[in-house]
Swiss-Prot record:
InterPro entries: Ufl1, Ufl1-like_C, Ufl1_dom, Ufl1_N. Keywords: Transferase, Ubl conjugation pathway. It is an enzyme of class 2 (transferase). GO terms for molecular function: UFM1 ligase activity; UFM1 transferase activity. The keyword Cell wall biogenesis/degradation does not apply. This is E3 UFM1-protein ligase 1 homolog. GO terms for biological process: negative regulation of NF-kappaB transcription factor activity; protein ufmylation; response to endoplasmic reticulum stress; reticulophagy. Residues 389-445 are annotated as: Disordered. Belongs to the UFL1 family. Disulfide bonds: none annotated. It holds the Pfam family UFL1.
Amino acid sequence: MTSWADIQKLASDLQRVQLSQSSKKLSEVNCIEVLQKLIASHRIDVVYTRDGHSYVTKNHLETEIKNECIAAGGRASLTDIAVALNIDFDHIEKTSRLIVSTDDEFTISNAEIFATEYVHRLRNELRTLLDEQGNQTTAALCKHWNLSSELLQSLLIEKLGSSDFQGVVDGDTIYTSSFLNARQLVLRAILIALTKITPISTIQKRVGLTPKRFWIAFENLQSLGEIPGTLIGSRTSPSCSYRPMMYDHLVKSCVLNQYRQNEFLEISTLKTLGVDAKPALEEVLGSSEFKKLVSMRSMFMTKELMDQCINAVQEDLQKSGISDVHLALQSLNLPLDTADEDEIGSKVANVEKDSHFAEGFVFKGAVLTEALRSIDKLLDVRAHEEVDRLEAEKKKQGGAKAAVKVQEETDDWGDGKKGGKGGKKNAKSVKGGSKSSAPSTSSNLSANISINSEELEIWLRESQSVPEEILSVIVEKLNQETTTLLRKKVQDIQAHQLVASVANSKKSLSAIGDKCRQLYDSFNTFETATSTFADPLGSDLRQYLLKTVGNEIALALLSYVMGVDNAHQLKEKQREETIENLPEMLRDPIRSVFASLKSTDDDALDKFHDAVYNCSAPSATSLALKKVDKKGRAEVGAKITAELHEQLCSQTEPATTLLLSVLYILAKAGRPTTASGKFVSQLVAQIKDLCPENVFDLLQACQKGVVTCIKNKGDEVAKEMLVNDISSLKQSIMP
């Protein structure tokens, strides 16, 4: 910088020039010319003002800029300096950057130049603010001083580590040590004053520290042993809470006082206190007291209080035989929920003999007995109605002609596959003989007898023997029992009617005996015809014969020894019970007949004949069943042929008509056979020599048509062709 001596020298030179003669002075034009030559020769470095009338050296410009900055308080805008000095902004900015690069006491940022004096003033002002408030954020300081955060950081905050600053810079906040110490003491006071579990977020908000400074203060207190409590959960969790020791003491006192006063503890209260877990409760009460508690859904209670609850319900139950658990427990004034009351009701039902619990009521078995007694007359009326219905259905079944049975599986009419053995569940058959076509075993009609819950509820409501509150419960418990009782009454009535009909048993026995003989004659006739077919067809037909006609013979024999023609109505279990109750001389032969039906050995028919012979011996039924001779077989065959002819005349269903046609041709040829639809394809191949060629062709066409219609039920063209072929077949084989 220019010294005072230089200034004095310039002043003396100026005075000397002013005192010289005019001839020795330079005119303004000469001065300008001289300066231009000096500038052109780079002898001097100057900067012109904006109007071009003045100039200043760069060194002097630096001095002017520094003076302007200091005059503005240490902070001046480059734009304001350019206006004040009347110099272009670019020269001002360039010179300012040169100043900053050479002088550490100045800095530039955002088109502003700052002097060290300004930084000192900011530091003093910051110290004052911190002394007043204890902390300041950089955002607030930036707004207060109109500085950018980066500039504030570089000018002030980064230089606060000196010994004259007693504080901490944490992130974007500046704290004084005294402020942090005061906040730590506030935290200590809060932690000591708390008596309940409090979220850490609430405590932190009250202390007024950032999470980082809060946990630093917390750890400082913890290291000093000044934390009278524990943390619940992770520090980083939003649900982290503080549990003071005083809270544990108060909770324990509260739980113990409630337990001693009430003899129960509500789980909702324990949850609020944070001791709902069994280990925590055991720690509060002690192991011995905890073992005395009865755990329920909404509370823990002592065994003595549970006994009081049970006794209250028992006393109410003894009065009327019915107890509303909720009302019975009201006198104890306990906050029980429905699940607790149900548990107590179940305990009472287990303790009280012949008691039941349902829908909040405990009631004695006598209530059920009285309810049944009140509807006994209604059950009697219903039983007679059911007996009449069963008799009507039985007569309807017995009066209807047995329909011709046709195999329903789609592969039964196939192209020559081996026929399945007789007696399959879904196999249907056609067999000749006027008496040999008895219906197969039907389901026991009495199994359909029942009383639905709606009807039972109406009966009980009308009888007024059951309180409305437990009516639905009684209905549910008695539903099966009333059905069983009704069936027993029906059986008793049927048994009574059976005894009344014993007078007509002789005629019935004679008819059943004739039926047995006719069935056995048909069986022998069919068996003889099966021997004309080669195996495996012959063996399959014999097995089928055994499962169908043989089964009917066995049922007829059982009906004969029972004296009532209803063996076909019995289920297998009932049939076995009936056989078991027969006298020994009848039981073993009848059982042997049924056992032979299940045999699949080659000698199954021989076993069946032996069993039938033993059953018809004088020591058993005295029916004297025997194999029919050739003349007898011819008579039976004629009857079968006549019946098949009659059925063919009335039959219109194509599949059944085809089966009847095949059986009719075989019967006319002296080979009467019983078979189902699955044997049709094999039997057609066997009768090629028994009928004219055109009939055989029609049989094959019909057989293919039946298969096509079964597989393609919507094919109307195939159905029409089949109907035409069946019509032609009937006309061809019937005279």
